[in-house]
UniProtKB/Swiss-Prot annotation:
GO function term, MF aspect, one: arylamine N-acetyltransferase activity
Name under which the protein is recorded: Arylamine N-acetyltransferase 2
Purpose: Catalyzes the N- or O-acetylation of various arylamine and heterocyclic amine substrates. Participates in the detoxification of a plethora of hydrazine and arylamine drugs, and is able to bioactivate several known carcinogens.
Gene: NAT2
GO terms (BP aspect): xenobiotic metabolic process
Gene3D superfamilies xref list: 3.30.2140.20
Consequence the record notes for mutating residue 203 to D: In allele NAT2*12G
This protein's UniProt keywords: Acyltransferase, Cytoplasm, Transferase
Length: 290
């Protein structure tokens, strides 16, 4: 695996030598705008691989994306390779339809330490809950970013990540009640602890998410990619674009229902993905919002 190939994949041409917050932020922003958050392999009859070599080949050489266990593992490798003090952590996503956090450790995120300060780094949340900059590990502090206001809160060793969203203006009125729209302005995202993890801790969950009838990833095909102004999301046959803060502290959200031919075209032109296999789009159950 070649770190320069990774940097070329994400379009990063800046410093590799300064292990500071600016460099960390720059790398994160480049990755989330180049590497889609997606699970399309599952809906093409292929597996979501967990091995680092396979992930590197999939994302860097084949120009694909992945879910958190893949994109954050790749980011972990890149950051440690250039010298950042980086730790894997495990998280539990909030599930809006059932109003509780997942019982299993379904999320991989990173902690990076710079000059004695700890930051949460995550390239694998997707949609409008994706951070654009690292979050300082401080409890109770609002941390405004372009997508929203993020806030970390610690209670008895458990950290909770929440977001405060803007109002949203939906251009297509037939989608006003779409299950893809977040319903609350204050939204829970996930919880985590600071216990260091290894990728082996996620092996059984990686299998479970692809095989269990209760896994929302089986019922949902998704692909999302951040842009300088917003985020594209493809869920099943529905393409959305959310432009953050387009006016008056309001996000603009556009919906479009695609045909099978248009799905392939959108993947190629917007997400820069060529699958090479037949995709079976699935609409999901409301666990994933845009």
């Amino acid at each position: 695996m070649d770190i320069e190939a990774y940097f070329e994949r994400i379009g990063y041409k800046n410093s590799r030598n300064k292990l500071d917050l600016e460099t960390l932020t720059d790398i994160l922003e480049h990755q989330i705008r180049a590497v889609p958050f997606e699970n399309l392999n599952m809906h093409c009859g292929q597996a979501m691989e967990l091995g680092l070599e396979a992930i590197f080949d999939h994302i860097v050489r084949r120009n694909r994306g992945g879910w958190c266990l893949q994109v954050n593992q790749l980011l972990y490798w890149a950051l440690t390779t250039i010298g950042f003090q980086t730790t894997m952590l495990g998280g539990y996503f909030y599930i809006p339809p059932v109003n509780k956090y997942s019982t299993g450790m379904v999320h991989l995120l990173l902690q990076v330490t710079i000059d004695g300060r700890n930051y949460i780094v995550d390239a694998g949340s997707g949609s409008s809950s994706q951070m654009w900059q690292p979050l300082e590990l401080i409890s109770g502090k609002d941390q405004p970013q372009v997508p929203c206001i993020f806030c970390l809160t610690e209670e008895r060793g458990i950290w909770y990540l929440d977001q405060i969203r803007r109002e949203q203006y939906i251009t297509n009125k037939e989608f006003l009640n779409s299950h893809l729209l977040p319903k609350k302005k204050h939204q829970k995202i996930y919880l985590f602890t600071l216990e260091p993890r290894t990728i082996e801790d996620f092996e059984s969950m990686n299998t479970y998410l692809q095989t269990s009838p209760t896994s929302s990833f089986i019922t949902t095909s998704f692909c999302s990619l951040q842009t300088p102004e917003g985020v594209y999301c493809l869920v099943g046959f529905i393409l959305t674009y959310r432009k953050f803060n387009y006016k008056d502290n309001t996000d603009l959200v556009e919906f479009k229902t695609l045909t099978e031919e248009e799905v392939e075209e959108v993947l190629r032109n917007i997400f820069k993905i060529s699958l090479g296999r037949n995709l079976v789009p699935k609409p999901g159950d409301g666990s994933l919002t845009i």
